[in-house]
């Protein structure tokens, strides 16, 4: 879910064409959940193969990545590593929501309420090791690079943008700003939504809010993040006001006698000194066409005609570049 900063952060709408020739680091967890939630049958059932294995994520990776790359936008998927121990409560809470949603989904199906069933089905989406491994396998076959983060994928993606290995992070969450991403793109067509992309630039955001990056993190900790509850009754607007008035989170906590749900120094370091890997390779390769056909069509029952049509978009993307070396 991420920190709720929408009330104080103003994204700027852009066109897909504005991203032409750019490289974006895709928050894999965020994007795969979008695929699992949105690519479903009318009653909310995820796409599955003949053996009952979920394939919604594979469909999303193939068709939606193809649509983006056809527009000459290169993508790198960044996967989460081990979860920070302070995120345990958030993970448990989300698991409970998924379990309850799954119960409501099945109940709605039994009652024949398709609309309600689909609403709860979306909330019941869950990640598994099988989904993660099959996603990476497909990316390898497609020639799309991916990076395995040691910790938070958003932190790794943000680091890659800071290092110049990508132009922006593609994610629906605002957490990447806390991790220091210079640019975050929301509503990229990877989500499947017919919305114009939005871009948030960290430097201009801090300038508009008249705060530093550290103060932005402090404000988020007051509101609540995936790693702490925050202070009840403090939203983004009030949090911003308090940080501007007091200067930092320590003075706010002292004056309000508030508890943010953790040690502010430790919580700060999660965002300001995140665990990232400097050892990664980014290289685009030509798709292994027959390997993709074998994996998706033979093993998972995809339509060969549709898969081959999508693969032509990957091939077409490379032909629009000045030379093949620009991509592969």
Swiss-Prot record:
Q: Which UniProt keywords apply?
A: DNA damage, DNA repair, DNA replication, Endonuclease, Exonuclease, Hydrolase, Magnesium, Metal-binding, Nuclease
* Annotated PROSITE patterns: XPG_1 (PS00841)
The UniProt annotation puts the region (N-domain) at 1-98
Which amino acids does the record list as binding Mg(2+) 1? Answer: 27, 80, 152, 154
Per the annotation, how and in what number is the cofactor bound? Binds 2 magnesium ions per subunit. They probably participate in the reaction catalyzed by the enzyme. May bind an additional third magnesium ion after substrate binding.
Needs which cofactor? Mg(2+)
Q: Where is this region: Interaction with PCNA?
A: 320-328
The UniProt subunit note reads as follows: Interacts with PCNA. PCNA stimulates the nuclease activity without altering cleavage specificity.
What family does the entry list? Belongs to the XPG/RAD2 endonuclease family. FEN1 subfamily.
Q: What is this protein called?
A: Flap endonuclease 1
């Amino acid at each position: 879910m991420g920190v709720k900063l929408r009330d104080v952060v103003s994204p700027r709408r852009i066109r897909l064409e504005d991203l032409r020739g750019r490289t974006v680091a895709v928050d894999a967890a965020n994007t795969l959940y979008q695929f699992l939630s949105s690519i479903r049958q009318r009653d909310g059932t995820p796409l599955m193969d003949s053996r009952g294995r979920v394939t919604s994520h594979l469909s999303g990776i193939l068709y939606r990545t193809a649509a983006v790359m056809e527009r000459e936008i290169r993508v790198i998927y960044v996967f989460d590593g081990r979860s920070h121990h302070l995120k345990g409560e958030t993970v448990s809470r989300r698991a409970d929501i998924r379990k309850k949603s799954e119960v409501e989904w099945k109940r709605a199906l039994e009652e024949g309420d398709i609309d309600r069933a689909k609403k709860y089905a979306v909330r019941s989406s869950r990640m598994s090791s099988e989904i993660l491994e099959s996603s990476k396998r497909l990316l390898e076959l497609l020639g799309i690079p991916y990076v395995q983060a040691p910790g938070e994928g958003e932190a790794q993606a943000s680091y890659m943008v800071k290092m110049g290995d990508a132009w922006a992070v593609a994610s629906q969450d605002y957490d990447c700003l806390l991790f220091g991403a210079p640019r975050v793109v929301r509503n990229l067509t990877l989500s499947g939504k017919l919305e114009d992309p939005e871009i948030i630039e960290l430097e201009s955001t801090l300038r508009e809010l008249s705060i530093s990056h550290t103060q932005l993190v402090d404000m988020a900790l007051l509101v609540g993040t995936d790693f702490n509850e925050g202070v009840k009754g403090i939203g983004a607007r009030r949090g911003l006001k308090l940080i501007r008035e007091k200067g930092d989170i320590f003075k706010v906590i002292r004056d309000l006698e508030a508890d943010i749900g953790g040690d502010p120094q430790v919580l700060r370091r999660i965002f300001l000194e995140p665990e990232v890997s400097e050892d990664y390779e980014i290289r685009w390769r030509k798709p292994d066409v027959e390997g993709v056909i074998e994996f998706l069509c033979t093993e998972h029952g995809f339509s060969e005609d549709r898969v081959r049509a999508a693969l032509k978009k990957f091939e077409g993307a490379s032909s629009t570049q000045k030379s093949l070396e620009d991509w592969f």
